[in-house]
Amino acid sequence: MKRDALFNMIEQQIRPWDVSQPDVLRAFHDMPRAGFLPASHRAFAYMDTELPLVIDGVDTHTTLLTPRVLARIVQAVDLKKTETAAQVGLGDGYLTALLAKFAKSVTVFELNESILYFAQRNLNQHAVRNVNYELSWGLKNGVDQYDVLVLAGS
């Protein structure tokens, strides 16, 4: 059932949104979204809907982007293994994991400590190691040190 939902997400949501790069589609296949969501939302992991980020029963007032939007972002930034990325706004860590598959490193900036630790735990559980974490509003030292900048939160 989960594999069918993952397949449908890729074929019926992501591809129709003009995401066609094989390596991006493979990244979504190899990094299932459900593993990044709170248990209460895993049943909705592959639906084309924004989900609230609830951590330990507490609403963080953060909304997670849909898979098709995440795929569009990953394809658009077109990261290379020699490039570094900065991501402002962390969410559940799923976008970070996808970006990290393509980048030399990703530095994430998050204001909410519980979101940062939740995402960090998710990324560690999925063996994503090329991520640096900053508990701050982000980019206090400018953007020149990064090849790509992704604004994923506001």
Residue ranges with predicted function:
Residues 1-45:
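N-terminal auxiliary segments of SAM/dcSAM-dependent transferases
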Residues 11, 45-55, 63-83:
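Conserved alpha-helix/loop element of class I SAM-dependent methyltransferases that forms part
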Residues 21-22, 67, 113:
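Alpha-helix N-capping/helix-start residues
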Residues 36, 40, 53-55, 99-100:
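Alpha-helix boundary/capping detector
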Residues 74, 78-154:
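Conserved nucleotide-cofactor-binding alpha/beta core module
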